[in-house]
Swiss-Prot record:
Family in the record: Belongs to the thiamine-phosphate synthase family.
Binding residues for 2-[(2R,5Z)-2-carboxy-4-methylthiazol-5(2H)-ylidene]ethyl phosphate: S133, S134, T135, G163
Swiss-Prot/TrEMBL cofactor(s): Mg(2+)
SUPFAM superfamilies: Thiamin phosphate synthase (SSF51391)
Protein name: Thiamine-phosphate synthase
Pfam family, one: TMP-TENI
Natural source organism: Pseudomonas paraeruginosa (strain DSM 24068 / PA7) (Pseudomonas aeruginosa (strain PA7))
Functional summary from the UniProt entry: Condenses 4-methyl-5-(beta-hydroxyethyl)thiazole monophosphate (THZ-P) and 2-methyl-4-amino-5-hydroxymethyl pyrimidine pyrophosphate (HMP-PP) to form thiamine monophosphate (TMP).
UniProt entry keywords in alphabetical sequence: Magnesium, Metal-binding, Thiamine biosynthesis, Transferase
Amino acid sequence: MKLRGLYAITDSQLLDDGRLLPYVEAALRGGARLLQYRDKSCDQARRLREAASLRELCERHGAQLIVNDDAELAARLGVGVHLGQTDGSLSAARALLGRQALVGATCHASLELAEQAVADGASYVAFGRFFNSSTKPGAPAASVELLDQARPRLHLPITAIGGISLDTAPGLIARGVDLIAVIHALFAAASAAEVERRARAFSALFETA
């Protein structure tokens, strides 16, 4: 599967009160190719249950599930994992999950971190925040010039994250970004139908790029 398109990331606060599964399915119907389950709570039983349900939805829609910051849960479910810089060893996650698993790495605004992630076995790297982010307002800012430097040096998919909207995504795609990671601009919606409409709009940006 080529890693290109909309990368949907869940948020436990945005998707509470029973919204998680219907909103995620709407995003998948709208064309999301990757889904990251991001839940920082300590309720292991709920996290396992929700992640298993999301895996079924992804399989149904031809997408791939990635678990944030929990290689053991990812291994249990046979899915991928995304690791931040403080979330543990990327090479250990690769060894645990196997050669075929998707393993992503947060690299903030650092090309050096990205090159190290590649050496450690990452499937893709994520740069950002590119714009003001509701999820991580204190994250280091990344510039579009970083993408110009990264594209010729990194021979694997590049993800952009951080406050990205339908208005700002085209400029990032034009700079060679393969995946646009979105949380609020996708899931902060009044209905599942609106989530699907937004997902289709994001996905369409890659068809014209």
